[in-house]
Amino acid sequence: ADRVILQFPFYWYSSPALLKEWEDEVITAGWAYAGAHALKGKELKLVVTTGSDAAKYRKDGEYSHTMEELLSPFEVVAYKVGMNYAEPFLVQGTATIGDAELNQAAADYVSAILD
């Protein structure tokens, strides 16, 4: 595989604990870095959903942080193991999204992961 896609809902400004556990178990010294580079040159693509709308994830928004900032730990891990960090695919406002918006997001998702 040339690409690793991590798809998850955003809970409390982070990824679910199970994804963090996966990172701890898989991205290890001797396999992903420090002597071996199994992920080097591969692309890391995040697919993330948020219940809150995008306006809340701005410097001047309710959460005072951007999604780019909140997802930066994934970018740092990608850099550490020699991966290419791709622009995340975000679907925001899922708590109130309508059918038309959801259908468009689904079509955009297919394009994003097949790109």
Annotate each predicted stretch with a short phrase.
Residues 71-115:
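Glycine-rich phosphate/pyrophosphate-binding loop and the adjoining helix
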Residues 1-75:
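Helix-loop-strand module that forms the ligand-binding subsite of alpha/beta enzymes
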